[in-house]
Amino acid sequence: MTVADRTRLDNFDATRAKAIAEARAEGAPADVATLDKVLAGDLLPLHSYKFDGDWRCRTIKIGGMAPKLVVYGWFKCRFHEDGAGLWLDKTTGSQRTRGLFYDDGETRMIYLGKSHYSYEKPGLYGDDPTRDQVAYAYRVGPKRARIEFPAPQYESLLDIIELERE
C-alpha cells in the first residue's frame, strides 16, 4: 500500500464524518434518505461469509463537490476468489474498478483496487498511482455490503459502492 493510501485510511473517520455532514446538509432529500439507508445496518462478521457471485452495485459520491451528494444508478459487480484472495470486478458502466480484499479484523476488509474505463483492460493496484483505489469494506446485512473510499482521486470526499446480492 502506498504512503498516500495509508494516509487516506488513517484519516478515514474524519473524512467520512465531514463528507456525510456535507451531504446531509446540502443533498436532495430523496438522496439523503438513500444515503441513510446505505449507511444503516450493523457490521457483520466477514470470515465465514461467501461473497462469490453476481451482485448489483451503485456508486454514491459524497461531499467535496457540488452537488454534495450524487446517487448513481445500479450496475453489475462480481466477486470471485482465487489463490490470491477475494476479488471484486465492476463489470458494467463506463467507470469500473477491479481489486483485491485484505483482512482487517472481524467486520472490516481493506480494498486495494484500480479504476479503469470500460474500454480499457483492467489493471492492478500499483500500476498507476492516479488510478489506485483504497477503501474499507463492510458486510451490513445478509445480502448487503458497502465499500467506502476515503478521499478518492477525483470529485468527492468519500465514495461508497453499495452492493446487493442478486
Predicted regions and their residues:
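Amphipathic/hydrophobic helical signal segments and adjacent flexible N-terminal regions
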Residues: 1-50
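Edge beta-strand at a domain terminus
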Residues: 32-37, 126-137, 142-166
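Mid-length scaffold segments of soluble, non-membrane domains
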Residues: 46-109
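An anionic, turn-rich surface loop/hairpin at beta-sheet edges
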Residues: 64-75, 110-136
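Short C-terminal domain-edge/linker segments immediately following a structured domain
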Residues: 84-90, 119, 141-146, 166
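Short, solvent-exposed aromatic-acidic interface loops
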Residues: 91-98, 114-119, 149-156
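A short, polar/proline- and glycine-enriched secondary-structure boundary/capping micro-motif
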Residues: 96-104, 120-126, 156-162
